[in-house]
Design a protein with these regions (language model features):
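N-terminal signal peptide c-region/cleavage motif recognized by signal peptidases
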Residues: 21-23
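Flexible "cap/lid" loop of the alpha/beta hydrolase fold
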Residues: 108-109, 113-154, 158, 181-184, ...
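Active-site catalytic motif of lipid deacylating hydrolases and related acyltransferases
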Residues: 27-85
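Active-site glycine-rich loops that stabilize anionic/oxyanionic intermediates
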Residues: 38-41, 94-95, 118
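Active-site nucleophile elbow and catalytic-triad environment of alpha/beta-hydrolase enzymes
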Residues: 172-194, 205
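Short beta-strand/loop motif that positions the catalytic acidic residue
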Residues: 201-203
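Gly/Ala-rich beta-loop-alpha elbow adjacent to hydrolase catalytic centers
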Residues: 91-96, 100
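Conserved loop-alpha-helix segment in the C-terminal half of the alpha/beta-hydrolase fold
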Residues: 205-231, 237, 242, 250
Length: 257
């Protein structure tokens, strides 16, 4: 009898080990997500999306951009990428789209997700992206300080940057925003990662910072899988579930390969 019990125990432990190993393997093979925030923001801009991704077992890192130049932000993103295990889905919002276009050439990056973002060609600047399209109203609410940095005014944050969020929240966003060096918008990319990596694009239909027509054109030009959301420039704040869903589709697509 003891021998039989011992055999059953051995089998049970073996099965348990198999299940644990399988679960561990699933976690190891699930791509991680690295998020690059845009101008006039910081990493907290993604506080509503991060837990939705984590709830699905996805490891998430949000880059804290210095916003001092394209090179500096790309360097910060590459540091984050160097700490990832396995495949990475790289996400960029607004100015962050320019950053991931450059940093996305990293071999760990398997897919790109653009959220109401710039998606320049190699050799282009962010400032060139809106040429030929109507000037978004929020541009008039970007103000320069005496040190060469740009910020959103409180009025612009409330009425143009995040017009679908409550005043109490936009007040916090104004206080925590990251000013960007004005010259960064004239920094040229050297590569276009989207030419070699599958891309997704989430278009914000009520965007008053990057014209929706510019976003639609960018998505078509880079051959991205396009989704649209009824949102201001910050769908990660007003429609976090929609944003998370697009990112998770990219994760699932990359993880299946």
């Amino acid at each position: 009898m003891k021998t039989i019990k011992s055999k059953f125990a051995t089998v049970a432990f073996a099965l348990a080990g198999t299940f644990i190993a399988s679960a561990s393997h699933a976690q190891d093979t699930t791509p991680s997500v690295v998020i690059v925030h845009g101008a006039f923001a910081d990493g907290s801009d993604w506080a509503k999306v991060v837990p939705l991704l984590q709830a699905k077992g996805v490891a998430v890192t949000v880059v804290q951009n210095p916003l001092t130049s394209l090179a500096d932000d790309v360097a910060a993103t590459r540091r984050a990428l160097s700490n990832q295990q396995g495949k990475v889905v790289l996400v960029g919002h607004s100015w962050g789209g320019t950053v991931i276009t450059e940093a996305g050439s990293d071999q760990k990056v398997s897919a790109l997700v653009y959220v109401a973002a710039f998606a320049p060609e190699a050799g282009q600047t962010s400032g060139e992206q809106g040429k030929g399209a109507p000037t978004p109203p929020g541009i008039s609410q970007i103000k320069a300080d005496g040190n060469g940095f740009l910020s959103m005014t409180p009025e612009g944050m409330a009425k143009d940057f995040a017009q679908d969020l409550p005043a109490a929240q936009t007040a916090v966003m104004t206080a925590t925003q990251g000013p960007i060096k004005a010259s960064a918008f004239e920094d040229k990319t050297t590569v276009s990662a989207w030419k070699t990596k599958p891309s997704w694009y989430l278009l914000a239909t009520d965007d008053r910072m990057i014209h929706p027509d510019v976003q639609r054109s960018a998505a078509k030009r880079i051959g991205a899988t396009l989704a649209e959301v009824h949102s201001s420039h910050v769908p990660q704040q007003s429609q976090p579930a929609e944003v998370a869903a697009v990112i998770l589709k990219a994760v699932a697509s990359v993880g299946a390969k």
